[in-house]
Amino acid sequence: MMKKLLSLGIAVFVFTSCARGEWRLVWSDEFEGQTLNTAYWNVEDNARGGGNAELQYYAPKNVTIEKHPLSGESCLVLNAQRENYKNRPCTSARLNTHDKVTVEYGKVEARIAFPHTADGLWPAFWMLGNNLATNLGNNDDVDKRAAQLAAEGRVVWPKCGEIDICEMGHHTGIENGTQDRFFNGACHWGESFNNGAYPNFGQFKTADYPVQGDFHLYTLIWSEDSIAMYLDQDRYPEAEPYFQLSLRGKEVNEPGHYFNHPFYLVLNLSVGGFFPQMPAAEKYPEVITEDDSSFQKVTALPADGTPVKMYVDYIRVYKKRG
């Protein structure tokens, strides 16, 4: 049964379930319709580069629902490809559930087939605090709008908090030749950006087997006291987490002060940026061409414009029983 709840004045769709065990399903998207469910998802349309000097234009046309070519399962697909589009040399996709679906504690899992990232792709499944002001443009606007943001109950990054459940494509994996097994989880927080000197914690993992090209399960378990992330819990239920962070410290600048409110979901497939060490020459450039020195290093996108695809089979959110 589906019911509509109100959380912080936000319409949030939640599914109830009679599933057995420690966890009960409270929301999911199985991506089985003909089109994306926009009651849940916002599709981004911009060239801001995520604040990370990325190279792509995020275009709504690059978000599709398709059958996986091998499994036949209906999936959300994020497509990245070479094409000159709105002053960018490539396009890709990013979408989020801001102000539509939020999570506060519980278990979040996603079954995803990440693409082969080397060299230059940066896919991620992550979360941001739902109190984030999303319409700022770039960081230059923050000081001018501080009072207005406070009145709206909004904050700027990283005060909202960020939970990166899985990222791939880091330059270390490229350098070590382990890019198909190298991934990480991370958290970011703090009162202000502070020229990059904000608190954060990340843990990198080199898996025993490839985690690109095929489906794998990525799980976040989040309580008032801790955050933990797991790979393939369905196959390896006793495996140790690849990321752990204590939230017991609740003072300002301690993580427990920032990860105690609703967060929304984000999926994206970036091209270039700081993470793979292929950034644009400027953080917010007006124009990037195919002659850009960083774009010249991107080998993961076929020269003929064939899309590279990130498949998402499902995302599910659970709460503990009792």
Language-model segments: what does each one mean?
Residues 2-8:
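Sec-dependent signal peptide recognition
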Residues 9-19:
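Hydrophobic h-region of N-terminal signal peptides that target proteins for export
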Residues 20-322:
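GH16 jelly-roll
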